[in-house]
Curated annotation (Swiss-Prot):
UniProt name for this protein: Glutamate--tRNA ligase
Subunit description: Monomer.
Single GO cellular component term: cytoplasm
Entry keywords, A to Z: Aminoacyl-tRNA synthetase, ATP-binding, Cytoplasm, Ligase, Nucleotide-binding, Protein biosynthesis
Length: 521
C-alpha cells in the first residue's frame, strides 16, 4: 500500500504484508525471440531452485506480446532447453496448468478488462501522439538536457492535463489509433524491499507515463506481466537487474489495481572477464551454443548456479548435482555485484562430470555418434565388438581423464575404432630410429605367441624383450604407440593395446613398418 506523510513532497511508500499460508510460486517468463541466453538459464534455474526448495511451483510463461519479434518454434525450443537442463516446469504452454493460458497472446481479453478498469478509475488515459511527434519531443528534451519523457499532451483536463475530454472522445469516435498510458502520480516516492539488494526508492519525477496498451490491442510487457503475475498467484519474482528501472511502474500498477505485490529479487548481471556485459559480440551467449559444443546439462547448470550465488563461508565444494543445489540454494546468498563468466571454469566442471559419470550414461551419448561415423568410414575392427558395451566401457575408463567432452570419446580417441590414416610427423622424427623396424619385426612374434594379451603381460614381455639388448623400454613404447594410434600421446600404452586386441595391434604394427619411413637427414 501507499503511505503519505502529508508534506509537500508526499512519501508514497509501497509496503508488503507477509504472505502467510501461500504456496510459493515462481515463474520464468521469456520472450520467444530466439534461443535461450545463459543469463536466462540462470534466471530460470534460480526460480526453479527457490520454488523447489520451498516445495512450491516453477512455472514457464511465454511473453509474446511483441509479435514483430516473435520467432517460429522459439517457445518450444525454450522449454525443451530448460527440460534438457533438468528444469522441468510444473506449468507451461506445453504442460498446461490451472492458471493458463500461459501464452500472453492468448490472454488479450484479460488485459483489455484491466485496462478499462484503469481508464475508468483515472489511472490511465488515451494518447494519440504519432511516432513523429514523440520523436520530435524526445529530441527537444535532449537538447534541453532533460531526461526524455512523454509531454502529456493528451492527458485529460480532469486528470491534471490540458486536453478536453471532448477532443479525446472525438478521436476515439473517428477510430484514430491510440495507445493507453498510465498516469504516474506527481511528487511521490515509490519504495520496495528487494530480497537481494535491500530497500530501493524511486522518485516519480524519473518515471514516464508508461504505455500499457499498444494501438494494435496488445499490452506492453510492463502491463501484461503485472496482470499475469497477480492472476497466476506468483509469490516471488526473481529476474535480472536490468528490470530494476521498471519496478516503480510495476508497483504503481499494483497500487492502482488494489493488489498486493509479490516479493522481488533482482539478480546481478553476467559479465565478460573484462567486466563488460556478456553479449553475443564477445562470444557464445545462448545455451544452444554450448549444447552444440558438447557441454552437458549438469555442467552448465552447475556453472550458472555459481554465477552470483555464494555457497557460504568455508564451503569449498564446487561440483553440485541439481538436487544438492535445490537443498542448499538461498536468495540471501546471491550477491549484488556482477558475476564473471569464465569459460575455463565451465570446462573444468565438464571434466569433473565426465570423470564421475556412469559409463552407461556416456555410452548412451557416444554410441549414436560412433554408429554415425561407422556409416561414413570403414573400420577393420569388428563393428559388433567396438559398439558393444564392454568395449566402450573399456575405452571410457581409459580416456576419462583425457577428454573434455563426451563426443571426444569418439573423435579424440578415434584410433580405438578406426585404423590410423596418418602418423604424427614430429613423433616419427623424434622416436623412429634406423633400428625401429627391426625391433618391431623381432617383437611381433612375442606378441603373437603370448598366452594372455593383457596389459600386465604385454608390459612384462616388452621389458623382458629389451633388457638383454641393453635398451630402455622407451625404445619400443614410443614406436608401438605411434603405429597403434597414430599419435604420441594417450592413455597407458599397455592398457590401450589390451583394449585394441592382439589382431588389431599386430596388423597396425605391420602397416606402420611398411608405411613409416625415416625422415631425410
Amino acid at each position: 500500500m501507499f503511505l503519505t506523510d502529508g508534506s509537500s513532497l508526499n512519501s508514497l511508500t509501497m509496503t508488503r504484508r507477509m504472505m502467510v499460508g501461500k504456496r510459493v510460486r515462481t515463474r520464468f517468463a521469456p520472450s520467444p525471440t530466439g534461443y535461450l541466453h545463459v543469463g536466462g538459464l540462470r534466471t530460470a534455474l534460480y526460480n526453479y531452485l527457490f520454488a523447489k526448495r520451498m516445495d512450491g511451483d516453477f512455472v514457464v510463461r511465454i511473453e509474446d506480446t511483441d509479435q514483430s519479434r516473435k520467432v517460429a518454434d522459439a517457445q518450444e525450443n525454450l522449454i525443451k532447453t530448460l527440460e534438457w537442463a533438468g528444469l522441468m516446469p510444473d506449468e507451461s504452454p506445453l504442460h498446461g496448468g490451472d492458471f493458463g493460458p500461459y501464452l500472453q497472446s492468448e490472454r488479450l481479453d484479460i488485459y483489455k478488462k484491466y485496462c478499462e478498469q484503469l481508464l475508468e478509475a483515472g489511472h490511465a488515459y488515451h494518447c494519440f501522439a504519432t511516432s513523429e511527434e514523440l520523436e520530435e519531443n524526445r529530441q527537444l528534451q535532449l537538447k534541453q538536457g532533460l531526461q526524455p519523457k512523454y509531454n502529456r499532451k493528451w492527458l485529460p483536463e480532469d486528470m491534471g492535463g490540458s486536453m478536453p475530454r471532448s477532443e479525446i472522445q472525438k478521436k476515439l469516435d473517428e477510430g484514430v489509433p491510440s495507445v493507453v498510458r498510465m498516469k504516474v502520480p506527481d511528487y511521490v516516492s515509490v519504495w520496495f524491499e528487494d530480497i537481494i539488494r535491500g530497500p530501493i526508492e524511486f522518485d516519480s519525477a524519473t518515471i514516464d507515463d508508461q504505455v500499457l496498451m499498444k494501438s494494435d490491442g496488445f499490452p506492453t510487457y510492463h502491463f501484461a506481466s503485472v496482470i499475469d503475475d497477480h492472476l497466476m498467484e506468483f509469490t516471488h519474482i526473481i529476474r535480472g537487474e536490468e528490470w530494476l528501472p521498471s519496478m516503480p511502474k510495476h508497483l504503481l500498477l499494483y497500487e492502482f489495481l488494489g493488489w498486493e505485490p509479490p516479493k522481488y529479487a533482482h539478480l546481478p548481471l553476467l559479465l565478460n572477464p573484462d567486466r563488460s556485459k556478456l553479449s553475443k559480440r564477445q562470444g557464445d551467449v545462448s545455451v544452444e551454443d554450448y549444447i552444440r559444443k558438447g557441454y552437458s546439462g549438469e555442467a552448465i547448470v552447475n556453472f550458472v548456479a555459481l554465477l552470483g550465488w555464494n555457497q557460504g563461508e568455508g564451503c569449498e565444494q564446487e561440483v553440485y548435482s541439481l538436487q544438492e543445489l535445490t537443498e542448499r540454494f538461498s536468495l540471501e546468498r546471491v550477491g549484488k555485484a556482477g558475476s564473471i563468466f569464465t569459460i575455463d571454469k565451465l570446462n573444468w566442471l565438464e571434466k569433473q562430470y565426465i570423470k564421475n559419470r556412469p559409463a552407461e550414461d556416456i555410452i548412451r551419448v557416444i554410441k549414436p555418434l560412433l554408429l554415425s561415423e561407422l556409416e561414413k568410414k570403414e573400420t577393420l575392427l569388428d563393428p559388433a565388438t567396438i559398439t558393444g558395451e564392454r568395449y566402450l566401457e573399456d575405452v571410457i575408463e581409459l580416456m576419462r581423464e583425457r577428454v573434455g567432452f563426451e563426443r571426444e570419446f569418439v573423435t579424440f580417441s578415434s584410433y580405438f575404432f578406426f585404423e590410423p590414416e596418418t602418423y604424427e610427423e614430429d613423433a616419427v622424427k623424434k622416436r623412429w630410429t634406423p633400428d625401429t623396424n627391426s625391433l618391431l619385426d623381432e617383437f611381433l612374434p612375442v606378441l603373437e605367441s603370448m598366452p594372455d594379451f593383457t596389459a600386465e603381460a604385454i608390459e612384462a614381455a616388452l621389458k623382458e624383450f629389451v633388457a638383454p639388448k641393453g635398451l630402455k623400454a622407451a625404445a619400443l613404447i614410443h614406436p608401438l604407440r605411434i603405429v597403434s594410434s597414430g599419435v604420441s600421446f594417450g592413455p597407458s600404452l599397455y592398457h590401450m593395446l589390451e583394449v585394441l586386441g592382439r589382431e588389431a595391434v599386430v596388423r597396425r604394427i605391420r602397416k606402420g613398418m611398411a608405411v613409416i619411413t625415416l625422415p631425410q637427414q
